Amino acid sequence: MPASYSFDVVSDFDRQELVNTIDQVQREVSQRYDLKDSNTELNLVDEEIIIHTASDMTLKAVVDIVLQKATKRNLSLKIFDFQDPEASSGNRLKQVVLLKKGLAQDVAKKLSKSIRDQLKKVNVAIQGNSLRVTGKSKDDLQLAIEILRKQEDGLEIPLQFENYR
């Protein structure tokens, strides 16, 4: 029996699922009657999605499709940070959607403090973009996960729990 147990708290998304989502959106945009001639482009570049389209109406339709397909592929909608649409060349609109990944330092401190305040038998360490929660019993760690899940609704990022040992 190990002396202590631990798990990591991260904020991440499955990149392959996101690629599949973008592919499905492109396919639907090319097949839908109202969007077929809009000359809409979606590009996934590093940590952002770039949408080029003809009008505000088609932009809203494409964003709705992206959110719908992401939900069906079990991607949290909290990973999307929609920037303001801007005018692009040729009377077109461009919208950049930033993808949130990793725990920000202030969020990590807030989560760490809330766990420490409620559970005295658990140690929390901030490790870059993640939190390492360590405790002597699995029950304490499960309580820590419960505390974090309750707080997740108030956060602007999704939380995942990994490396449960």
Swiss-Prot record:
Note the InterPro entries from the entry.
Answer: DUF520, UPF0234-like_C, UPF0234_N, YajQ-like_sf
Q: Which SUPFAM superfamilies does the record associate with it? A: YajQ-like
Q: Which UniProt keywords apply?
A: Nucleotide-binding
Q: Name one GO molecular function term.
A: nucleotide binding
The transmembrane segments are none
Which CDD domains is this protein grouped with? YajQ_like
Q: What role is this protein assigned?
A: Nucleotide-binding protein.
- NCBIfam families registered for this protein in UniProt: PRK05412.1
What the record says about family reads: Belongs to the YajQ family.
Please state what the protein is called. Answer: Nucleotide-binding protein Pro_0479
Record lineage: Bacteria, Bacillati, Cyanobacteriota, Cyanophyceae, Synechococcales
